[in-house]
Amino acid sequence: MKRGRHIMKDLFEKAVAESKELTQRPSNETLLVMYGLYKQATEGDNENDPPSNPFDFVSKAKYEAWLGQKGKTREEAMAEYVELVNKLKG
């Protein structure tokens, strides 16, 4: 099982690097999904308090994107992130 996790982590790290080299910028909605999956994969469930500034829409959107991934294992989030980046690469 450890080997599978190590392989997934390598694939995830490769996908993170590739996401920075996409030829077309993904939509804001897709970027938020990527952000949520990345945070879930690297930190696990979002246990933070929501942003306190009601006018900080970017932080609120990021918070909610991560919160939307709650319950997924880190490996599941990594796999979904890899799949999404591969799809975006075409």
Residues covered by each model-derived region:
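A charge-rich, low-complexity, intrinsically flexible signal that marks solvent-exposed coils, linkers
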Residues: R3, I7-G90
